[in-house]
Amino acid sequence: MKTTSPPAKSALLKALIAFAIAAGIIAFLFYYTGTRRGPSPAERETFFKQSVTPILVNNTFANTKALEALDTNIHTQFEQYRGRVPNFTADITGFGNKAKITWEAVRQLASGDQKKVERHVTEKFEMNVVSAKRMQEDMETLLKGFCRDIEANRNRMLVDIEAAVKENSQMSPRSIKLQDVFAEEINGKISQLAKNSGHDVALMTSLNLLASLAADYAVTTLVKAALVRTGASLLTIIAASGGTAATLTAGGGTVGLAEGPAGFVIGLAAGCIVGYIVDSVMSDRLEKKLNSECTDFLTKAETSLTKDKDGLIQSLDRALVEMQRIQSPVINHQLEVLP
């Protein structure tokens, strides 16, 4: 009986191994390019409703909580400002200060010089309560914290969607990286929406912030814009109140203009304070009244900043609604182009 030589056996074994490898590769390619198909429109729609929509709902809820936290933090910050008012009123109503302010205010009304006395009061206010620079920095710090929360929520949403796609055998033969494409596409749409927001400057500024997320320039721009609107709102309220405070406040706002929008708000406070002192200089309850009026002014400033339609919180709320509206089709588009 004829036997196969060892070299022949080795060659045959190698041929069989090569054949098996080739067959495996062919089967693999056949499966993924032939019998393996991408999800149908119906399958994709079902997946989106059952797996993606709950994730988007959770993201909306998390963003709402982040905005509520920002609102609470702003309130807490203004509570700190209000807590410092008694020190300021005790300082400003001391005999020397009260006499100086009253005398300078009378001269101001007669001469039209509306700066000197407000500067004195502004210095006292900034020393005891809050400076224009510190107020702006405080608001920017809080807003940056909000941006970090929104960014964390966005990243969590994308990771959860990626995991859902990976776990669903009908969706894709490979995992996807939404974060690689989402930021560019969603930010492009947000920026475009901001350009098309027309005269809604508050919404446009808020959308630009959400598109850049915590970029220092965007944060500063939004805070300054919000403080400008706050100052304008306060000026309207004060002017409607009448009295010496209203007369002097018109000039008081100009004292802080060099320090930006927060300086404008502090300048308005100074004008009000001078007016209250002049109107009540002979009253033995001046300090108590001034304490009440200063606290009320800060409360109105907080309300304007957070509750007005174009205030910081309300404009961010509208921007979040718009962002949530456009991110759904962006994600759906990424699912449509899955292999």
Q: Where is each model-derived feature located?
A:
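Amphipathic, membrane-inserting segments
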Residues: 19-22, 26-29, 60, 64-65, ...
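N-terminal intrinsically disordered, acidic low-complexity segments at the extreme N-terminus
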Residues: 1-2
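Pore-lining and gate-forming transmembrane alpha-helices of multi-pass membrane transport proteins
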Residues: 200, 204, 208, 212, ...
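Membrane-engaging insertion elements
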Residues: 43-57, 117-126, 130, 223-243, ...
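Extended, amphipathic alpha-helical coiled-coil scaffold segments used for oligomerization/tethering
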Residues: 86-196
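N-terminal Sec-pathway targeting helices
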Residues: 5-22
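An N-terminally focused, membrane-permeabilizing/fusogenic/translocator signature enriched
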Residues: 19-136
